[in-house]
């Protein structure tokens, strides 16, 4: 995993989980080979993904459709890149 999104979602983490699954079917799987989503309580979440094309991921997250979805669902997050420390 090389990307982490840490945030909150007003409509609940299961809403986000359903949307991630939908997005993977509509093309996000082209640049995200695997992902996991953890519910941290109080509508908080940690999403981890293995991104094979950071430019593609950035472009996907910044589309008008995605930004509207975030606003409509009260989804606020910070994105972090990560690297594996050792084998």
Q: Could you tell me what each predicted segment is?
A:
Residues 1-69, 75-87:
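Short S/T/G/P-rich N-terminal loop/turn motif that feeds into the first structured element of a domain
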């Amino acid at each position: 995993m090389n990307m982490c999104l840490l945030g909150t979602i007003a409509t609940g983490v299961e809403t986000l989980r359903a949307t991630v699954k939908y997005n993977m079917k509509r093309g996000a799987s082209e640049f995200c080979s695997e992902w996991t989503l953890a519910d941290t309580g109080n509508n908080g979440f940690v999403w981890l993904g293995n991104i094979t094309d950071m430019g593609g991921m950035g472009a996907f997250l910044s589309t008008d459709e995605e930004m509207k979805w975030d606003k409509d669902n009260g989804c606020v997050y910070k994105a972090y890149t990560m690297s594996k420390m050792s084998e």
